[in-house]
Amino acid sequence: MFTITVNDIERIFQDYGIYEHCAGFSELQRYHYEEDDPDSKEVRLIVKAETNSGSAVVIRFKNEADVTLDTVTAQSKFAVLLAENGIETPKIYHANGQYARWYQISGYKVIVTVEDFVGGELKEVDTKTAEQTGRLLARMHNVSETNDFHVQNDVLFHPLKRNDLFSFEDFAVHKEYLKSVHADLYHKIVLGYSHLLEKVRFFENEPQYAVQGDISDCNLYRNAYGTIGVFDFNRCGDNVLYYDAVMQAVFEARLMIYPKEIAKAPEAVILPAFLTGYHQERPFTDRQIEVFPYLYALISAFWLFDMRWSEHSLANAIEQADADAVLNWMKEICNRMAYLPSMPL
């Protein structure tokens, strides 16, 4: 298992221009790749390192199959660009101009980055926070577009690719079983999916720009002046900005922690708050507003949590050969595809 010592951290401090001693450190996040493969040399470790003066920095250690030094460097440069343009982000340190560099530590080769530790992490999302986050995302998009900034990396929220919100593939992989339950309904769903996808494809060839890629409560903080900021550019990459805006909005409206008074139906208030905030900073075009219902229906119909992860998911119903439950899911998917709400601005 990858391990670090205070001496390792002090060496990093020196390289990155932090001329203090390390008073201690704690792990914030660790991926245990060795559990699946004892010989794995893949690493993702994030630590909080405290200095003898009482300040703290976050050090990220990475060695993953899909991560390159160029990618991490570009992600760091994007965070710096945002900060230079008024977006609240933690200070990113550099070692002689390098925001990311390779280290050999305890027998592992890892990419290292260093940034200030920030407090005030947001634990839940209310309508005010959602509106402010929408504004923040729009301003970030404006900076990225204005500066023609790019990061070559896959993102979580692109509707025309594998993504973390919905998956038609998780439906279609069960084609034969679904057809055995109700062939006509299966074909209706496939045709409906094609119709929605064709509408959403309108923006497929739009220019793509760098996005942070994972606006959420666990990656947001509020500074001492009440300004919302963003950290963690691990999922930063190029995306069509409209796709990023809508999918981030739905993500924020469905998958966060919310105050008790809205927790039972957060989307009804969080989604319009987020999109309205975004629209005030970066107005949606008529065409973007027109396409929204189809993208929303696509996300809802094949919502990944319902397709795969929920205890009562379609996948579980199929695994249990519960034909009645599967038929109910097929009917529900049809209903969701038919629900085409206007963009709630």
Predicted regions and their residues:
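A glycine-centered beta->alpha junction motif in the catalytic cores
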Residues: 108-124, 171-173, 300-316
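Loop-centered beta-sheet repeat module
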Residues: 164-220
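ATP/Mg2+ or Mg2+-diphosphate-binding catalytic cores
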Residues: 302-345
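ATP-binding pocket architecture of kinase catalytic cores
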Residues: 52-151
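Conserved NTP-binding catalytic cores of kinases and kinase-like/nucleotidyltransferase enzymes
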Residues: 1-94, 224, 341-345
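Active-site acidic catalytic loop and adjacent metal/ATP-binding pocket
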Residues: 35-59, 195-243
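A cross-family kinase active-site recognition segment
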Residues: 127-183, 208
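Active-site activation/catalytic loop segments of kinase-like enzymes and analogous catalytic loops
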Residues: 242-282, 297-314
